[in-house]
Amino acid sequence: MAKVGKTIEHPVTGERITFLETAASTDGTLLKMAFEMRPRAFIAGAHAHPRQEERFAVGSGRIRVKTGGREWIADEGDEISVPRGAGHTWGNPFDEPAQVVVELRPALRAETYFETYFGLARDGRVSARNGLPSLLQFALMLHEYRDEFAGPPPLGAPGAVLAAILSPLARARGYRARYGTYEDPDGP
């Protein structure tokens, strides 16, 4: 579990996250993170949070958010909320860095997902092209964290079925949905 103040980095996407509030510090109410994004940073693939609302507050720079067929350019001081279950994508395609505070409500296990995903990247276990782990690792993580992350409607259901089918194979091949080495050794 992440601790307040812990910072993790994804060397391929150029994202840096500092945990401002965690599941433990808020009794599960929210996960609050400061994202630092380099110019023209990797744009997150379309996804949804089946049981979480996501909020973005731009501290500096700007980001692009797409959801429900609409696109917003959010500048410094702007805030955007994406309702639970809504497919969306977001990132920094611009020429300047961006700092964004992201909240997920409730927290669920999203911090463990981020610790695992960024830890895999730090250890060179993701694609240098797109920053994603192997198909089996990704399928296992999507299945394990299906309350936190899913493909956007209408792709979410087939993706969830495929992840469920591939998860036993991934485990048999030695993949895990979380690795203790990526989590804070002192706990919450």
Per-region residue spans from a language model:
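Short amphipathic
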Residues: 32-36
